[in-house]
Design a protein with these regions (language model features):
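Solvent-exposed loop/turn segments at secondary-structure junctions
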Residues: 1, 24-28, 73-77, 105-107
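A bilobed periplasmic-binding-protein/Venus flytrap-type ligand-binding module shared by bacterial periplasmic
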Residues: 1, 96-112
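Bilobed "Venus flytrap"/periplasmic-binding protein-like clamshell domains
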Residues: 1-57, 130, 144-148
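Extracellular/periplasmic catalytic domains that process cell-envelope and extracellular macromolecules
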Residues: 12-13, 92-93, 111-113
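An extracytoplasmic/periplasmic, membrane-proximal ligand-sensing/linker region
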Residues: 26, 30-32, 36, 40-43, ...
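Beta->alpha turn/N-cap motifs
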Residues: 53, 67-76, 95, 102-103
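A ligand-binding cleft/hinge motif common to bilobed small-molecule-binding domains
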Residues: 58-85
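Short beta-strand->loop
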Residues: 80-94, 98
């Protein structure tokens, strides 16, 4: 067991650990890939294992590898017992959810939902990363319907009667 809190904490122990991720993370194209990541943090893992994206969490749970890359808001992290390390050197970009709606959609619903844009704006800044983890966990792990989980969230925040 290691006392790891930040990605840079991996540096002294990486040689004892196996890194695993989906095939695409190991391609040479793009800046957010294995090569640039390990170079940026000066990490030298014992081995690197490429897995199908649909099998990554199952492989992590089975202990096929010790370290992987994930979306921090994925509820499967909790199911797999993964500890999300702080990206203390800022290698990965921050991802903040935002609503995008096509102008023609607003036009199409102008009569039946004239306040659609304002209604969506009520959600701005209301969904924290922990909220996302909780909701995706309920849907992906507990098997609840996304509609039910979303309605419960909206109701608990006074956005749905």
């Amino acid at each position: 067991t290691y006392d790891l809190h930040k990605i840079s904490d991996l540096q002294p122990v990486a040689g004892q650990l196996v890194f695993g991720a989906e095939h695409e993370f190991f391609t040479q194209e793009g800046s957010m890939k294995f090569g640039p990541f390990t170079e940026y943090y000066d990490l030298h893992f014992k081995d690197a294992v490429s897995v199908d994206v649909s099998l990554k969490y199952a492989a992590a749970e089975k202990g096929s590898f010790d370290v992987t890359e994930v979306y921090t808001t994925d509820g499967l992290n909790r199911k797999a017992g993964l500890v999300v390390l702080e990206d203390d050197k800022g290698f990965f970009p921050e991802y903040n959810g935002a609503f995008l709606i096509r102008e023609d959609t607003l036009t199409r619903f102008a009569q039946s939902a004239p306040n659609l844009e304002e209604t969506l704006d009520l959600l701005a800044g209301k969904i924290s990363n922990e909220d996302m983890v909780d909701m995706t966990y309920q849907v992906d792990v507990q098997g609840r319907s996304a509609d039910e989980v979303a309605a419960e969230f909206l109701h608990s925040h006074g956005l749905l009667a």
